[in-house]
Curated annotation (Swiss-Prot):
Its main location: mitochondrion. This is Delta-1-pyrroline-5-carboxylate synthase. One of its GO terms (biological process) is proline biosynthetic process. InterPro entries: AceGlu_kinase-like_sf, Ald_DH/histidinol_DH, Ald_DH_C, Ald_DH_N, Aldehyde_DH_dom, Asp/Glu/Uridylate_kinase, G-glutamylP_reductase_CS, G5K_ProBA. It comes from Pongo abelii (Sumatran orangutan). Keywords: Amino-acid biosynthesis, ATP-binding, Kinase, Mitochondrion, Multifunctional enzyme, NADP, Nucleotide-binding, Oxidoreductase, Proline biosynthesis, Transferase. Residues 1-361 are annotated as: Glutamate 5-kinase. It catalyses: L-glutamate + ATP = L-glutamyl 5-phosphate + ADP; L-glutamate 5-semialdehyde + phosphate + NADP(+) = L-glutamyl 5-phosphate + NADPH + H(+). Substrate binds at S117, D223, N246. The gene is ALDH18A1. PROSITE patterns: GLUTAMATE_5_KINASE, PROA. ATP binds at S266, D267, M305, G306, G307, M308, E309, A310, K311.
Length: 795
């Protein structure tokens, strides 16, 4: 039915559209809904939420994060957004998605208005169809329906196309909005309607009444009779913007209606510092009016009237009038596919116009500084990088009181908001700082032979030698939750490996992170590489950071399994090092020592239950049930107040069992433990492979053959024999500290220290060598001789 409305416009409304509207309003089951709308509603995943809404009353929002509070919103749809690529007809799928997003926001209690193009394109299609119908049969057969574009069609006057297309365009909008129980109303205006005071009052009153009745006004310039543009002033000489196109119309409408937000959708990502498509063009995230001189404009779009310069002029005028503005791409949304709702949710989409000059560098600028700073860091001598890390270790102990005071502020603000395990992670202490300093000095000692180490030397041919050497990965983004002690650890590893570093901590640790970052930069300053480590503003969304694929080479999440999964999902194009879960197992064999078991279980589960290497599932050999050893384990867990969850097999052995576990694949992160029964070591291995996360798994036994079988067959990053799961840690492994624990199977696995932050490059030194010299009749032959690797002096 939409295709009929789209084809014939408003005239055949009674014949084609009315029966469908009637059947949808009374919900007759035998009526078929339009395929376009049915498809849109089936894939829709826009969250229907209610947020606190407030009018800005003439003052624009200062930050993107505030846009979610916008109540009155104007969405301007450019010609390139609503029309097809052939400039003849509308992009129905794109338009349906836009209507859906506007409807969702309207149903949240917002007041939505549309300024739309498309009447000319709609009318052009209808008039071309009329020309085809006016042909003779012979002409029609000769040209063919699919060759309509190649016909000798006279140039169609834009005003005539607009007149022919307005009714059909509005009928299409009505049909789409009806699916969301929303009414739409059309308003056609010209520049004179804004210059005549009486007409302005009438327009203003009409729009307010429509909004009051929960109707979406659809506004367009009356292109059928549009007069030439007026000067940019009203009758009293006050500076206004003349309605020359829909960009200026949207800005004028937004200011007249005291709108909170104006969204201008075009066919480009936003405002660039140079014409899009040029090699050095960079998208401007936040545009401050004072930066206008730094922008170079290109040509306008294929079908638009104004181009980017007109959009920026209109946006700045609206901003001056108290309306926040975002210019974004409405043709190929880059985030979730829902550009309008993404903008309202405060996501980094397009260019946000703000009267508040950004405080400090943008995250893109921080990425560039980390890149250049990291390259400078990599060129330092190993002794200089070690000196920086030693100085940072000294600062952690010398500035202990200031660090603990900042951490106390974080703890006070987090009290009652964070769960006890997270509060424990957030807390710093003198002993933690001392351990940090010791770990940093270990990193400094190991950094002497890291960057530039020769791994392989090969003589390819005479006077042609190849070397493989270690080099930094580039720029690392480390995202961590509630762990301020993670900051100096990761910073030291990045310094030792010559990597640039972006740090994104949780807002719950803002005070602690700030002082620790200042101390890190103070240490870096002794060799002039202060910018190598950057602390990203807490306003930056993690999802936005994960899209900076041109600035970030590796993402390392440190936090909950949900955080890791979210980052792995969002980071398209950037490798992620980490583990999504830490489901660690301990298998107690039938030949386990009674004296060892309780010590190992207590340490693995109770020493630090919030850690990712804490024990989560205890596997017991069935022969140990109802034995003193089993009773001893249970008694110890009761004393430690550990809540026990029974696995299915374990529950079947008990008359009165603890609560049966909901899932055998659970990371508790607290004093909770799953106990399950297995038949033998192979059964334990099968259980671990089915329900584990390939993190850390342990066997407790006195049988060496059984232990070796377990060690060789369990496919996890860390596999231990008669040792606590808590040893799975970079510091305890002698790595100095760890940047994280990886369960992936490439590059790095297990606790990742300094070595995991390095990659390699190949250096080939020759003397006028060319490949043709090695052909069948060439003068040279390949030798491929392995050469000794020189030992570096690390004293």
């Amino acid at each position: 039915m939409l295709s009929q409305v789209y084809r014939y416009g408003f005239q055949p409304f009674n014949q084609h559209l009315l029966p469908w509207v009637q059947c949808t309003t009374i919900s007759r089951s035998h009526c078929i809904q339009p395929s376009v709308i049915r498809h849109v509603r089936s894939w829709s995943n826009i969250p229907f939420i209610t947020v606190p809404l407030s009018r800005t009353h003439g003052k624009s929002f200062a930050h993107r994060s505030e846009l979610k509070h916008a109540k009155r919103i104007v969405v301007k749809l450019g010609s390139a957004v609503v029309t097809r690529g052939d400039e003849c007809g509308l992009a129905l799928g794109r338009l349906a998605s836009i209507v859906e997003q506007v409807s969702v926001l309207q149903n949240q209690g917002r007041e939505m208005m549309l300024v739309t193009s498309g009447a000319v394109a709609f009318g052009k299609q209808r008039l071309r169809h009329e020309i085809l119908l006016s042909q003779s049969v012979r002409q029609a057969l000769h040209s063919g329906q699919n060759q309509l574009k190649e016909m000798a069609i006279p140039v169609l006057e834009a005003r005539a196309c607009a007149a022919a297309g307005q009714s059909g365009l509005m009928a299409l909008y009505e049909a789409m909005f009806t699916q969301y129980s929303i009414c739409a109303a059309q308003i056609l205006v010209t520049n004179l309607d804004f210059h005549d005071e009486q007409k302005r009052r009438n327009l203003n009153g009409t729009l307010h009444e429509l909004l009051r009745m929960n109707i979406v006004p659809i506004v367009n310039t009356n292109d059928a009779v549009v007069p030439p543009a007026e000067p940019n002033s009203d009758l009293q000489g006050v500076n206004v913007i003349s309605v020359k196109d829909n960009d200026s119309l949207a800005a004028r409408l937004a200011v007249e209606m005291k709108t909170d937000l104006l969204i201008v959708l075009s066919d480009v990502e936003g405002l660039f510092d140079s014409p899009p498509g040029s090699d050095d063009a960079k998208l401007i995230d936040i545009f401050y009016p004072g930066d206008q001189q730094s922008v170079t404009f290109g040509t306008k779009s294929r079908v638009g009237m104004g181009g980017m310069e007109a959009k920026v002029k209109a946006a700045l005028w609206a901003l001056q009038g108290g309306t926040s503005v975002v210019i974004a791409n409405g043709t190929h949304p880059k985030v979730s596919g829902h550009v309008i709702t993404d903008i309202v949710e405060g996501k980094k989409v397009g260019t946000f116009f703000s009267e508040v000059k950004p405080a400090g560098p943008t995250v893109e600028q921080q990425g560039e500084m980390a890149r250049s700073g990291g390259r400078m860091l990599a060129t330092l001598e190993p002794e200089q990088r070690a000196e920086i890390i030693h100085h940072l270790a000294d600062l952690l102990t010398d500035q202990r009181d200031e660090i603990l005071l900042a951490n106390k502020k974080d703890l006070e603000e987090a009290e009652g908001r964070l769960a006890p395990p997270l509060l424990k992670r957030l807390s710093l202490s003198t002993s933690k700082l001392n351990s940090l300093a010791i770990g940093l000095r270990q990193i400094a000692a190991s950094s002497q032979d890291s960057v530039g180490r020769v791994l392989r030397r090969t003589r390819i041919a005479k006077n042609l030698e190849l070397e493989q050497v270690t080099v930094p990965i580039g720029v690392l983004l480390v995202i961590f939750e509630s762990r301020p002690d993670c900051l100096p650890q990761v910073a030291a590893l990045a310094i030792a490996s010559g990597n640039g570093l972006l740090l994104k901590g949780g807002k719950e640790a803002a005070h602690s992170n700030r002082i620790l970052h200042l101390l890190t930069q103070e240490a870096l300053s002794i060799h002039g590489v202060k910018e190598a480590v950057q602390l990203v503003n807490t306003r930056e969304e993690v999802e936005d950071l994960c899209r900076l694929d041109k600035m970030i080479d590796l993402i390392i999440p440190r936090g909950s399994s949900q955080l890791v999964r979210d980052i792995q999902k969002a980071a398209k194009g950037i490798p992620v090092m980490g583990h999504s879960e830490g489901i660690c197992h301990m298998y107690v064999d039938s030949e386990a020592s009674v004296d060892k078991v309780t010590r190992l279980v207590r340490d693995s589960k109770c020493e630090y239950p919030a850690a990712c290497n804490a024990l989560e599932t205890l596997l017991i050999h069935r022969d140990l049930l109802r034995t003193p050893l089993f009773d001893q384990i249970i008694d110890m867990l009761r004393v430690e107040q550990v809540k026990i969850h029974a696995g299915p097999k374990f529950a079947s052995y008990l008359t009165f069992s603890p609560s049966e576990v909901k899932s055998l694949r659970t990371e508790y992160g607290d004093l909770e433990l799953c106990i399950e029964v297995v038949d033998n070591v192979q059964d334990a291995i099968d259980h671990i492979h089915k329900y584990g996360s390939s993190h850390t798994d342990v066997i407790v036994t006195e049988n060496e053959n059984t232990a070796e079988f377990f060690l060789q067959h369990v496919d996890s990053a860390c596999v231990f024999w008669n040792a606590s799961t808590r040893f799975s840690d970079g510091y305890r492994f002698g790595l100095g500290a760890e940047v994280g624990i990886s369960t992936s199977r490439i590059h790095a696995r297990g606790p990742v220290g300094l070595e995991g932050l390095l990659t390699t490059k190949w250096l080939l030194r020759g003397k006028d060598h060319v490949v043709s010299d090695f052909s069948e009749h060439g003068s040279l032959k390949y030798l491929h001789e392995n050469l000794p690797i020189p030992q570096r002096n690390t004293n």
